[in-house]
UniProtKB/Swiss-Prot annotation:
Belongs to the U1 small nuclear ribonucleoprotein C family. Signal peptide: none annotated. Keywords: Metal-binding, Nucleus, Ribonucleoprotein, RNA-binding, Zinc, Zinc-finger. This is U1 small nuclear ribonucleoprotein C. It is found in: Nucleus. GO terms for biological process: mRNA 5'-splice site recognition; spliceosomal snRNP assembly. It comes from Anopheles darlingi. Component of the spliceosomal U1 snRNP, which is essential for recognition of the pre-mRNA 5' splice-site and the subsequent assembly of the spliceosome. U1-C is directly involved in initial 5' splice-site recognition for both constitutive and regulated alternative splicing. The interaction with the 5' splice-site seems to precede base-pairing between the pre-mRNA and the U1 snRNA. Stimulates commitment or early (E) complex formation by stabilizing the base pairing of the 5' end of the U1 snRNA and the 5' splice-site region. It holds the Pfam family zf-U1.
């Protein structure tokens, strides 16, 4: 009868049966050996990556560290304020001339929506009214109407 060999533990089990393999694989020593095996493998992969990067750098295939120069400076220019003219309603001072006016909320203009977000709703519900879509639904009718006078 063939014996089962465990590569992680470098040992033969007494015989090849599912119960013996299951018992062995749930043991503490086997689990420690598996963990050690994969830790060693990850260290070897990391060292290989470091060696390959170093060789490529020495060969001139990789430029200097792009992170040492710092982030690129944004090209921001703030337009000068308009003299002798008050800002129009819904327009924030300093906004580009072609920008649309912002929506007016109860506390002034609302900020523009963030990327990936819906714009705010146009209609604000009044007190006592549920928001749109949250009202009461009509009762659901069953397939057959109920009989009032059964015979």
């Amino acid at each position: 009868m063939p014996k089962y060999y465990c590569d992680y533990c470098d040992t033969y089990l007494t015989h090849d049966s599912p119960s013996v393999r299951k018992t062995h694989c749930t043991g503490r020593k086997h689990k420690d050996n598996v963990k050690f095996y994969y830790q060693k493998w990850m260290e070897e992969q990391a060292q290989h990556l470091i060696d390959a990067t170093t060789a490529a750098y020495k060969a001139g295939k990789i430029a200097q560290n792009p992170f040492t120069a710092g982030p690129p400076k944004p090209n921001i220019s703030i337009p000068p304020p308009t003299m002798n003219m008050p800002p129009r309603p819904g327009i924030i001072p300093g906004m580009p001339a072609g920008a649309p006016p912002l929506l007016m909320g109860p506390n002034g203009p609302l900020p523009p929506p963030m990327m990936g977000m819906r714009p705010p709703p146009m209609m604000v519900p009044t007190m006592g009214m549920p928001p749109m879509g949250l009202g009461m639904r009509p009762p659901v009718m069953s397939a057959a109407p109920p009989q009032l006078n059964p015979k």
